UniProtKB/Swiss-Prot annotation:
Cystine bridges: 29-40, 57-146, 123-138
Main localization category: secreted
GO MF, one annotated term: metal ion binding
Subcellular location: Secreted
Domain of life per record: Eukaryota
PROSITE patterns, A to Z: C_TYPE_LECTIN_1, C_TYPE_LECTIN_2
Record-linked InterPro entries: C-type_lectin-like (IPR001304), C-type_lectin-like/link_sf (IPR016186), C-type_lectin/snaclec_domain (IPR050111), C-type_lectin_CS (IPR018378), CTDL_fold (IPR016187)
Role summary: Interferes with one step of hemostasis (modulation of platelet aggregation, or coagulation cascade, for example).
Name listed for the protein in its UniProt record: C-type lectin 16
Oligomeric and partner information: Heteromultimer; disulfide-linked.
This protein's UniProt keywords: Disulfide bond, Hemostasis impairing toxin, Metal-binding, Secreted, Signal, Toxin
Entry comment describing in which tissues the protein is expressed: Expressed by the venom gland.
Residue ranges occupied by any C-type lectin domain in the UniProt entry: 36-147
Amino acid sequence: MKRVRVKVIFVSFGLLVVFLSLSGTAADCPSSWSSYEGHCYKPFNEGKNWADAENFCTQQHTGGHLVSFHSTEEADFVVKLAFQTFGHSIFWIGLSNVWNKCSWQWSNGAMLKYEDWAEESYCVYFKSTNNKWRSRACRMLARFVCEFQA
């Protein structure tokens, strides 16, 4: 009788350990979001300009933003995820020059003191057919991927 109790306790403990270890993998992300390296991702198959897409992402979850890439592996994961949602397409990522703060310099080495820029800002999208970043006017519509830290 004592052996049976010990086996039951041992098996129960083993199952508890397995359950707890599995529950921390994808459970950190809400339903319909995908987990990778402690972050949650979700592609959205609707066209928005960059600012509206970023605003939408911030409303989806605390700490949410348009996706940012920090490794090839992360980009590959997001591209596969986006492909499942909207196939080969372009989608906004969280990189932009909205504030026009690039460090410009004249070709003769002189600092830029006079400016007369058009009001157009440029934001970055990801082109899934060649896995490259490109810029376009932020006002243009594109699909997008949101991300937040789990």
